[in-house]
């Protein structure tokens, strides 16, 4: 399998449109750990096949198909039989999306019952958006994205909000990403067994406390890398023992190296 540093991929961010990010990846066999980005994610399969698991359901994605992942929805999208696949992934800020969906309450949690989309018209519109972003043609781009967004099968989630324990646990976990509390410490603080904490939290979030913490650290790292912080500083800010540990964890959740993400371009000499 090619090294992650040799995979041709690029991240596109436009300063005048801070609510969007585009990723383009070619011929990658790199797998992802289960993750739950805070943005609305819309992927397009260009070549190869991808196996996506979301909300306990498995979807086989082929070229010409889209995959719609609501914000904070745990999922994994990985190559089938370790064969290479090429794809785009468009990330849209969740709050911005809600402002463009007036039929939904402003405090909605976005949800879909149809994540796999086999719609040639939507796929063509998606490709038009990708072309506009990669050529930095911003005039008319917001209107195209809003048109696409409003055509997606999105609803407001009817699910019950997380229980008090999970809400408190989230607040505790993100309060100090540089030195997150151990499960033993949390069990003592909440006067609960570790197994009970893990089970309750996973029922509400789809992730274990450890996975949630790693996701929060990587999301904060992405934010600091976009801001231009040095990779070694970001590794320290997010509480990793060393840069190697940070690199390995970042790759496992994003299928990209910190340097690829920070430099916003595809390079073949990432370390």
Predicted segments, located by residue:
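Terminal helix-turn-helix DNA-binding modules in bacterial transcription factors
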Residues: 171, 184, 202-247, 263-271
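Short, Lys/Arg-enriched anionic-surface-contact patches
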Residues: 156-165, 207-213
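Solvent-exposed, amphipathic alpha-helical segments
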Residues: 121-132, 165-176, 220, 224-227
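Short hydrophobic/aromatic patch on the recognition helix
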Residues: 64, 197, 201, 245-246, ...
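Amphipathic alpha-helical segments enriched in hydrophobic/aromatic residues interleaved with Lys/Arg
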Residues: 101-160, 171
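Short coil turns linking two alpha-helices in DNA-binding domains
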Residues: 189, 193-194, 241-242
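Short helix/strand-capping hinge loops at secondary-structure junctions
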Residues: 176-180, 208-209, 229, 257-258
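N-terminal regulatory/effector-sensing and dimerization cores
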Residues: 9-107
